[in-house]
Amino acid sequence: MAGMAAALAKERAAAAGAGRHGQAVPYLGQDFGALRRECLQGGRLFHDPSFPAGPAALGYRELGPNSYKTKGVVWCRPTELCSCPRFIAGGATRTDICQGALGDCWLLAAIASLTLNEEILARVVPRDQSFQDEYAGIFHFQFWQYGEWVDVVVDDRLPTKNGELLFVHSAEGSEFWSALLEKAYAKLNGSYEALSGGTTTEGFEDFTGGIAEWYELQKAPPNLFKIIQKALQKGSLLGCSIDITSAAETEAVTSQKLVKGHAYSVTGAEEVNFRGSIQKLIRIRNPWGEVEWTGKWNDNCPNWSGVDPEVRERLTRRHEDGEFWMAFNDFLRHYSRLEICNLTPDTLASDRYKKWSLLKLDGNWRRGATAGGCRNYPNTFWTNPQYLIKLEEEDEDPDDPEGGCTFLIGLIQKHRRKQRKMGEDMHTIGFAIYEVPPEFSGQTNIHLSKNFFLTNKAREKSNTFINLREVLNRFKLPAGEYIIVPSTFEPNLNGDFCLRVFSEKNANSTVIDDEIEANFEETEIDEDDIEPSFKKLFGQLAGSDAEISAFELRSILNKILAKRQDIKSDGFSIETCKIMVDLLDNDGSGKLGLKEFHTLWTKIQKYQKIYREIDVDRSGTMNSYEMRRALEAAGFKLSCQLHQIIVARFADEDLIIDFDNCVRCLIRLETLYKMFRKLDTEKTGTIELNLINWLFFTVI
C-alpha cells in the first residue's frame, strides 16, 4: 500500500515537471543548496549520513568488510591529500580519468566520452562547486535514471590506501571531479563494488538520458553509413574505438597513427564524387590531438585533388585539432566498435538538429501475476505487460524506395546493480513485437489473451534475450499499430523496467489493459420466494435471535466445507466471515437475517462451482494464473496492477490461492465496487472522500 502511494505521488510530481533536467529530483531527498548553506552557517564539513564513509560503501563481496582488498583503507578529503586540490582545472580531459582498483572501465570510457562535449558535461557535473568558493565538503552530480534526472549529493571523503586514491584519480593528482563523480555514481548504485562490469552504453545513457546503440564494425549492417548520417543530423553522440587484446596494447599506436583502446568521436559523414565514382568518407576526431590518421583521405592525401574544389574547401577548411577524414571502408577495417548515443529532444538546445520523437513507458513484472516469461512459456506469456505503439508517419527518406517507419526500442531493467549485495543480478530480458490484427485496431482496453499469442507470430523481436541492463534494437516497419511485449526469459521473476521508443516521426503509445468492470448478478427476493426447507435450516442454525453472526457463520460454513473432498481448505477464517457479513448486512445489525443469508449461500455455491471448473488439474487448489480466470468467471475484469495486488494479498509463497482466500477476494471486490457505485451517483468514475470516510472504507 505504501509503495502504491509513493508511486502515485511520484507520478503526480513528474506531471508537474519534476525529474526534467532543469528540475532534477533530489536523490534521497537531499537538497544540495540547503545542505551546503547549513554546513557553511555551522562552520563544519558535510558528512553524508545516507552514504557513510565506511565498509558498506565499498562493497559486499570482493570489496566487502573482510576482503584483503579493503584492509588499510582510509577515507580522506582532498584537502588532506594535497595542498591545493582543484575540482576542475583547465577543463575536463582524459588525463583526469585514470582507473583504480575497480573493474569499471566501462564507466570511465563513458566519462571520457563525456569530456568531448562541454555542454553535456556541464549537465552532469554542475560548475557551482569548488574547493575554494563556498567549500563545505559537499558536492553534487546529476544523472539520468529510468526516465528522470536525479541530483546526487556526496561528501568529499574518498577511499585511499597509502595516501593515494583507491579508485578513479587524475594523472596529475590534484584534480578531483572524476573521483567525486565516481563516488556519486557508486552511491546511486549502492556501493563501489556494484559498478564492476558493465557496458559503456549504460554510462552514456545515465549521463545524457539518451538511448545508446552499438555496432561491431566487422559485422556492420549494410546501411550503417546512412545510420551514421542520420544520427549526426539528429545531434547524436558518436564514439568509436579499436579493441585491445591485452593491457600492454592500451594507447598503442598503429602504423597509420591510430591509437588502440582510445575513445574517438565521429563528427561527420559525407559522400563525395572522386574521379567519377562516389566515395563514402567519415570524419573522426582524436579529442587530444596528438596523432592523426596517415592513410587515404588524411589532410595531406593527394586524393583531395580529385574532388570538386568547392566540396574540398567545405570539408577541410574548418578542421578542429586532431580531426581527420578517412574512407568509410578503412574505418570499418581499422576500428572495432561504433557507439551511438541518440539524445532526447530536451538535451538538444539547437534547432538545427532533426530531433527524435520519444515515448517512455514504465512497468513491472510481478511473480504470479505479470511475470509470464518469454514465448517458450505459452501458458503465461500472455500475462506480461502489453504496450500499443502507433506508427503514423513514414520516414522522410527519398533514397529509400521501400519506405517505412524507423524506430529504436530500448528495454531497461531498473535498480539491478543496487540489488547485487542482496544476491540479485541482472535478469535475462528481451521483447517481442506483434502487428495488431484488424479486429483489434484502435482498442486499448483488452489485454490480449493466450489464444492470440498461440495463433499470431511475432513481427519482430529483440535480437537476443540477454542479462544486461538494457536490450536495444533498431527496426523499420510499415505505418500501423503494433504491440510490444517485454518479458524476462523465465517466468515468475520480479522486476521493474522502463520501455523507451525513439522514432524518426511522431508516434503514440499506451498501455494495453483490461478496463475495470464488475458484472455480478443481483436478484432481489422476498422471504416468500425462499423454499420452506431453507427457512427450516436457517431457523436451526440461527437460534433464538433469528440472525447469524460472523462467528456462527464460520462454524456453519466450515462444517459444510469439511465434507467437500474436491476443495482443499483449512476452512474459512473469521476475517473472511466478517467481510461476508459486512457485504450483506443491510440493516447494520452486524448479523445476517434470512434473506441476507440466502443471498450469501447462493454466492458461495456459485464460487464453489467456479473454483471447481477453473481447477482443471483437480488439485483442489488454484494457482495465481487460474485465479485470473476465476475473477473473470465471477464477473470481474481487472487491470494488470490489480492482479498484482491480488496475488500479493491472497496467494501463498507457492502462488496457491485456497478457497477461503478466493472467496475473501471476490467478496472484497464486490463490496468495494458496490460502495463506489453507490457514491458515484453521476456515474463519472470519480468520487470524493474526506479523511474520515476514507478511513471507514479502507478498514473493511
Curated annotation (Swiss-Prot):
Ubiquitous. Pfam families: Calpain_III (PF01067), EF-hand_8 (PF13833), Peptidase_C2 (PF00648). Gene3D superfamilies: 2.60.120.380, Cysteine proteinases, EF-hand. Residues 345-514 are annotated as: Domain III. One of its GO terms (molecular function) is protein tyrosine kinase binding. Its EC number is 3.4.22.53. Binds 7 Ca(2+) ions. It is found in: Cytoplasm; Cell membrane. Residues 45-344 form the Calpain catalytic domain. Ca(2+) 3 binds at G91, D96, E175. It comes from the Eukaryota. Ca(2+) 7 binds at D615, D617, S619, T621, E626. Ca(2+) 6 binds at D585, D587, S589, K591, E596. Its cofactor is Ca(2+). Ca(2+) 1 binds at D658, N661. InterPro entries: C2_III (IPR033883), Calpain_cysteine_protease (IPR022684), Calpain_domain_III (IPR022682), Calpain_III (IPR022683), Calpain_III_sf (IPR036213), EF-hand-dom_pair (IPR011992), EF_Hand_1_Ca_BS (IPR018247), EF_hand_dom (IPR002048). Its main location: cytoplasm. This is Calpain-2 catalytic subunit. It comes from Gallus gallus.
